[in-house]
């Protein structure tokens, strides 16, 4: 299959994008693993939950690392506490703030020894939470929570960037090689605890950025899977692919939203009215109907409908009239005219789809405001680095929720990237009321009240507009008819554990 981009890391604690998540699920395993039944025990043999739902006891299966060493509760304790070390650069560390003292440890206010995760024996892990959580078991199935081999990590901090011989993992497949700029090759792990169900002998994940090249390779039989969740199919090819008899094209809604992000500390986007104007001036229907063509849904807010049914209606595309009025008001307040308006550059990851979409938005902004907008594309890792370093004005990026809970997407914007927790908020935007509402929702036992709190938080986000949601995503992919048993969820969990070829 094509992975489109190299994973940012093969260390599951450092995942930050979908290619990294896909690769981590191939190479590692966790206490639970996502299946069609939800979070299902994997390395955990038995799970006990306290009456107050704040303490979980995980009894572990007898399982082995790929180097033959036993996987123990101590590996889990070490891995989770290392993520919460203030000096460890885990972008998703905020997900572990649900652990007792997790947030305080990441801020350096308490030592990691005070975090609520303890190995009471090699096969017993006890976890204490800050508050009850309906999604905690689902979180243990997310690659961030997969353990790493403590001895390997302590002896060789570069183990995740080494060749296959030095790489130690726990999942259905072993790493054979990682050829930078080319591919990752894995083979069946004979020491995996459930190796008897793994039927594929080898998987090659290629790094092909050009969508047409990927499609041609699929059509020529060089790929068995093309497109989502790691890559995309050229939009102009979709109508013909959909009309084929016995089509191998599949489309399903996923818990993701593609947004244009604004750097709120850089002119002109320090102005809330400018951010609103630019967001309202985008005709999302044109983007979906003429460019994307994969049944995406115009985004009225951040949270996708497949995460929350009958979600609140927060229209952010209020039309050109309001966009122009806000633009004029902001220019008057800032003292800008046509000549002095700050130059604007829109950046995006290198793909034909993103380029065409950026060109369409560029034209819409020019027609609405009479300004010129420059476009700049980057290969994936460079693009992510530009966003993380806040070296941009407007940048397009999609996010897929880690969990089946609206809180997961909203929490991205709770703190800025320079906070110890990281979290992916590279807009410089921070709002105390927004953060307070999310914190209250986390601890709220009443589902109705919790929904109201999250809706109120999302309303603030959409009024302040550090992001302009464009569309709710779909997974659009090609799969050979003989490929069976692959699991792809609305969270873009792509799992080849049970995959096989039916010749």
Language-model features: locations:
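Alpha-helical secondary-structure segments
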Residues: 72-79, 122-128, 171-172, 200-202, ...
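Extracellular/periplasmic solute-recognition and catalytic clefts
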Residues: 176-185, 204-266, 289
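N-terminal lobe/hinge region of extracytoplasmic solute-binding protein
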Residues: 2-51, 168-169
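Append "and occasionally in soluble cytosolic enzymes with long acidic Gly/Pro-rich linkers
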Residues: 188, 270-363, 367, 374, ...
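Aromatic- and charge-enriched surface segment that lines or borders ligand/interaction sites
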Residues: 46-92, 126, 217, 268
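Gly/Pro-rich hinge or "lid" segments in bacterial periplasmic/extracellular proteins
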Residues: 37, 112-113, 118, 123, ...
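Extracytoplasmic/peripheral linker and loop segments enriched in polar/acidic and small residues
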Residues: 118, 289, 371-383, 388, ...
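Long beta-strand-rich cores associated with HINT superfamily self-processing modules
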Residues: 421, 477-503
